[in-house]
Amino acid sequence: MKQILVVGDLIADYYLWGRSERLSPEAPVPVLEVQRESKNLGGAANVANNLISLKAKVFLCGVVGDDLEGEHFINALKARNIDTSCILTDKTRCTTLKTRIIAQNQQIVRVDKEIKDPLNADLRKKLLDFFTEKIQEIDGVILSDYNKGVLDFELTQKMIALANKHHKLILCDPKGKDYSKYAHASLITPNRIELEHALHLKLDSHANLSKALQILKETYHIAMPLVTLSEQGIAFLEKGELVNCPTIAKEVYDVTGAGDTVIASLTLSLLESMSLKEACEFANAAAAVVVGKMGSALASLEEIALILNQTHPKILPLEKLLETLEHHQQKIVFTNGCFDILHKGHASYLQKAKALGDILIVGLNSDASVKRLKGDKRPIVSEKDRAFLLASLSCVDYVVVFEEDTPIKLIQALKPDILVKGADYLNKEIIGSEFAKETRLMEFEEGYSTSAIIERIKRTCND
């Protein structure tokens, strides 16, 4: 698990959701009838939250006010297992709060409560001391600058210098027009408008994009210069040449927090030794997930994998499957297995399982799970291909891949009407049976097994 230190401006995102179908008699403004409220972690905390969703360990450095919002904010961070030992309280400021009013899933106004003054010398010293203490034990750093007073020029440059001294990857999400503040960072993630304002250069051509990225590299000594281009993806330099990593087409509901998702996923993928191109593809996939949701949303590894693999529409992560089935009234049948080298016996078994109900869900062991259960030489067929083959069967309605050795979490979440296992489970404990209304044992078709097929192939090769 990678350990990442995030430093920056902490923002509490508050949402009022409802319907607006009339104007106020007091003024020509819409009236919102509130149906629900929600609170999200924003700013640098949203970056940290994205990293948690991507299975990283996160230390968060920032400042909240001495108020109720700050107290709630810290509790929300702890609930997400984000280290809060360097969240400082500033008695001279309020916790930054952005309130968004949403009517019929459209944002109609945002109200900001904030103080942008720079931190006092004592708070800056405490942040730098914590950074200095942590820099040796973490893998990478993200500076998330929302221009709310935490990351001034001097503190930013000291942190970049310390990260470079200890050979740590450091990425910055910049604000403002003076990019010398981020000089010598490993990578910065400006969007098109931010970079145009900083360099006073219109990015309306490949030539100007390339020129802008060269300036970041040569003038500001950014090791991996790139620019995010909204629906056009991400552009970066590779051996001096401009490369565009296109975005993944997806319906956009809300771009709130997409930049936080991009820098979090870029950081983690680079720390996992991906190339810059691979990291940009990963970040684009993560962004495609979050813009398809309302609010400062998160992308899970399973959702990103689904986008990257462009898999069959029947192959869903558990969260998405539960959403799909939320209002169903049909009888659900669940079974699971490795299904390595799909054969007639598998197909016959699944057809009989489907006949027991309306919706057949197949839990599929991941490659890592199969390897633990059956040895290093298995699976023969990758989980991506196994899932696709299963989804291609007309009797299978959904396929969900699980990483664990058993499907207990899937069964507990899905609570199927019927749990189907092979007849070889007779007089054996059936994991998850307590969460199903009924358990059925089903005979396999004789003469068919993956192991037998593998042995037959071996004998043929030896002959």
Swiss-Prot record:
Region (Ribokinase), start-end ranges: 1-311
Protein name: Bifunctional protein HldE
The organism of origin for this protein: Helicobacter pylori (strain Shi470)
MF-aspect GO terms: ATP binding; heptose 7-phosphate kinase activity; heptose-1-phosphate adenylyltransferase activity; phosphotransferase activity, alcohol group as acceptor
Residues involved in ATP binding: 191-194
Catalysed conversion reaction: D-glycero-beta-D-manno-heptose 7-phosphate + ATP = D-glycero-beta-D-manno-heptose 1,7-bisphosphate + ADP + H(+); D-glycero-beta-D-manno-heptose 1-phosphate + ATP + H(+) = ADP-D-glycero-beta-D-manno-heptose + diphosphate
Subunit structure: Homodimer.
Keyword set, alphabetical order: ATP-binding, Carbohydrate metabolism, Kinase, Multifunctional enzyme, Nucleotide-binding, Nucleotidyltransferase, Transferase
EC number: 2.7.1.167, 2.7.7.70
Cited Gene3D superfamilies: 3.40.1190.20, HUPs
PANTHER family, alphabetized: BIFUNCTIONAL PROTEIN HLDE
InterPro entries recorded: Bifunc_HldE, Cyt_trans-like, PfkB_dom, RfaE_dom_I, RfaE_dom_II, Ribokinase-like, Rossmann-like_a/b/a_fold
